[in-house]
Amino acid sequence: MTGRIALLSLTLFSPLSLASTPDGQALDFTHSTIGYAALLIFAIAYTLVMLEEYLQLRKSKPVLLAAGLIWAMIGYVYQQTGSTEVARQALEHNLLEYAELLLFLLVAMTYISAMEERRLFDALKAWMINRGFNFHTLFWITGWLAFFISPIADNLTTALLMCAVVMKVGGENPKFVSLACINIVIAANAGGAFSPFGDITTLMVWQAGHVSFLEFMDLFLPSLANYLVPALVMSLFVPHQTPSSIQEVVELKRGAKRIVVLFLFTILSAIGFHAFFHFPPVIGMMMGLAYLQFFGYFLRKTLARSLAKKTAIAMAKNDEAALKRIGSVVPFDVFRSISHAEWDTLLFFYGVVMCVGGLSLLGYLGLVSEILYTEWNPIWANVLVGLLSSVVDNIPVMFAVLSMQPEMSLGNWLLVTLTAGVGGSLLSIGSAAGVALMGAAHGKYTFLSHLKWTPVILLGYVVSIVLHLLLNHQSFT
């Protein structure tokens, strides 16, 4: 049993993720030199990923190299056994999985980048700053906004936006910054758990067809409880002070609100293709990219006329500041927004997909699946997945589960979606939002400051699981 637990830990603590093999005569290399070498390469690669902040080494680099080495070894051993076609089919299958993920995320990131370029998030930040809220009110406002924005935007962007407000208003109060950042991380992760667009893990579960778009809403109340339980406790310790008033003026660029509407239509297109035609949602997302491209064309073609009107108004009012802003206007370019996508993250996903493809073909994921989902009760296995995601990034953990293809009820698929999404809140290093805020609020929000509240966050984790088991018990049959 000890040996199996060790193998389980080693497997899940490396980026074993998103790959699965098609039907074919895959060979078992779990007890071979090649298999052990693959595990060692994964362990080293993931160690480097975890040390990204300290080494200043982008996380995509080690997993890209690991993927190449693993598949080179697989190619060699399958060539020796005369089964090259099996390995090639597995490789192509995983490349297709990655292509769907890449294009979907690229469109979503492009829209978020376009909203940032049109200053939509800057305007939201300025609105909160100008209201002169006290620390207690700001604690709740940033938390609620993080919870409700992250299902549409990604939780990382949401967390960074809310943290910018906290640092701008209360940066001189370390206690408030620490509590507010913890609250934001919990809220962003919890909010992302009940929407396919809120987190990469929920997106993958949706694309795999295990949970429909509307069925994700069954996780709303458990996710809400996951946020509210620790937030209510922490709010008792927030300083009851009012920071000095700051006035900040932000003018939205032309087309900002219409881009939000186009993004909503893009989401509806993705849902429609998946619901009505059973096509991959990425088809609707790519169609949505065309919406943005044509709108960008419209903005460029009408820019001169728009600037002429604004210039005439500014000259009539003798507004020098407005004239200066008009003179610095840069035409909207959708390809600039595409270039601002998080390419390190997208390449990291490639490494994760191919690494797990190799592990799956070598037989390790089948072995781990046997331990987790056959010998254990799936409910306890899914609770463990959430705890693992507090140490290991939830993306490789969830991709590993998807690659195992366990036979589970809808309730258990919802449970693993919930736990993988919110489990990362237990530690600051457990989610991209937490890691990013440690950098944005350096010295004020730290690993140790988050760790002090882990028992309260764990209480919220347990309450959310129990609430899901009670409210959605019919989906476990």
From Swiss-Prot:
Keyword Membrane: yes
One GO MF term: antiporter activity
Annotated consequence of substituting H274A: No change in activity
Periplasmic side: 1-33, 79-94, 151-154, 207-220, 278-281, 363-378, 439-454
Membrane protein topology class: Multi-pass membrane protein
Chief subcellular location: membrane
Any coiled-coil regions, as ranges: none
Mutation effect (S431A): Lack of activity
Name of the molecule in the record: Na(+)/H(+) antiporter NhaD
Native organism taxonomy: Bacteria, Pseudomonadati, Pseudomonadota, Gammaproteobacteria, Vibrionales
Gene: nhaD
